[in-house]
Amino acid sequence: MKPFPRAEISSKALQNNLARLREIAPGSKVMAVVKANGYGHGLLNVAHCLDNADGFGLARPEEALALREGGVKSKLILLEGFFSQVDLTTLVEHDIDTVVHNEVQLELLESSILAKPATVWLKIDSGMHRLGFTPEQFAAVYARLEACPQVAKPINLMSHFACADEPDNPSTKVQINLFNDLIKDLPGQRSLANSAGTLYWPESQADWIRPGIALYGVSPVIGDLGGNHGLMPAMELVSQLIAVRDHKAGEPVGYGSSWYAKEDTKLGVVAIGYGDGYPRNAPEGTPVWVNGRRVPIVGRVSMDMLTVDLGINATDLIGDDAILWGKALPVEEVAEHIGTIAYELVTKLTPRVAVCLD
């Protein structure tokens, strides 16, 4: 018996998406971003499936170490860098590249005695104003890294977009120009484009692209779909109907009796709720896919269940699949109904949801 709820992960879709991104950025290497448990798709699942990626981007040291312990030998890049001497020593020991974005990290490098030089990506704050050295700091920081014997040469260079998922926002072009002006004539590898940069700003693709959400078949742009770019959804979130009930006009359903039927109908109870990571704030009308059609959520999402209006003539049965998002019902569409982004939906599934790679 298959577990439910479950997130079915398509290796075919993952491989398609990597190949498609290579077509979109033919002159760039691909740093596949697999942080946050592979965007909810399973860290090792994704890394082994995409073992032909040129490297993997992680947020935290434990994620990178999990890949090394899982047999992944590819290039790994720690996007938030290290925050202790122990972390730095461990990264070097396991051949993990590190981003350097603040003075504390720089001083740790300068004061360390390492078994071999660390491979560094110097992060420039070109407009995101979250991590990185400012343009005014850049030259001095670069010179200190150049002079540091604990840093492998050449130094690699990186920045991150603030608004690339808004294709008409002029600030992205400003960031591209600022980054290119600062690093002009310097050696080392360059990386600027995230998923949105890769898809919408080809001039940002540089030596390495860093796709995250696009690898999983999802568009980073609200109102867009991954399928519009030849991407395939890699996750299908599936549960089952555990009850089908006749429901009379005027009767409520669920906590708070927030929804009343306007006419006689049949309701289906789906075995998934906020305890599984499905958002409690999903409003009435959010679609679920049952037997080839969209049916709306009615009433409140509870911890283990939600209810859908199947319609008076429904022939659905207990045990039938209910798809919360996937090929037929894009996660981007569900996110828009809920008032969130697809990133949040796929990364917030709890351990109660079985993640199954085909």
UniProtKB/Swiss-Prot annotation:
The keyword Phosphoprotein does not apply. Its cofactor is pyridoxal 5'-phosphate. One of its GO terms (molecular function) is alanine racemase activity. Pfam families: Ala_racemase_C, Ala_racemase_N. Substrate binds at residues 130, 303. The modification N6-(pyridoxal phosphate)lysine is found at residue 35. It catalyses: L-alanine = D-alanine. The keyword Isomerase applies. Pathway: Amino-acid biosynthesis; D-alanine biosynthesis; D-alanine from L-alanine: step 1/1. It comes from the Bacteria. Keywords: Isomerase, Pyridoxal phosphate. GO terms for cellular component: cytosol. PANTHER family: ALANINE RACEMASE (PTHR30511), ALANINE RACEMASE, BIOSYNTHETIC (PTHR30511:SF4). Catalyzes the interconversion of L-alanine and D-alanine. May also act on other amino acids. This is Alanine racemase. It comes from Shewanella sediminis (strain HAW-EB3). The gene is alr.
